[in-house]
A protein has these predicted regions:
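Extreme N-terminal tail/first-helix region
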Residues: 1-20, 75
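Short, well-ordered beta-strand micro-motif
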Residues: 128-130
């Protein structure tokens, strides 16, 4: 399907937000919100998390998600937007890393270095969220 200008505007309500709430769904349909850093690039969002995080299992089972701008502790700062999420393949990680590094700079480097030191190699994954 061809991209339209509306696709690039889908996530406009998130612009300027430092955090978002990603809502994934259990197989029962129960919503599970999680606050995360994110970066937008080319009309898509990039996120990072631990490979073993519950949200990864949930989005693999049910790729339909909701995203909403939030503060650091998950208080919503706007309306939720429907979206689709998928775990990126390792060869796609560079796009996500570059977008997150561009947005968060040294904070991103410091945080991921500290978190990765406490986990085995390959335990960090990246997720792309599309309209």
């Amino acid at each position: 399907m061809a991209e339209t200008p509306a696709d690039h505007d889908h996530f406009a309500p998130l612009r300027g937000a430092e955090f978002l709430v990603l809502t994934t769904y259990r197989r029962t349909g129960e919503a599970v919100p999680t606050t995360l850093w994110f970066a937008e690039d080319g009309g898509v969002l990039y996120l990072t998390t631990a490979a073993q995080a519950g949200k990864v299992k949930r989005l693999r089972a049910t790729p339909a998600v909701q995203v909403a701008p939030s503060d650091r502790v998950g208080n919503l700062q706007g309306h939720s937007l429907p979206a689709q999420a998928r775990v990126l393949e390792p060869h796609e990680f560079a796009l996500a890393i570059a977008a997150l590094q561009q947005k968060y700079g040294e904070q991103f480097t410091t945080l991921t270095t500290q978190m990765d030191a406490a986990r085995p190699a390959g335990s960090r994954i990246y997720v792309v969220v599309t309209p």
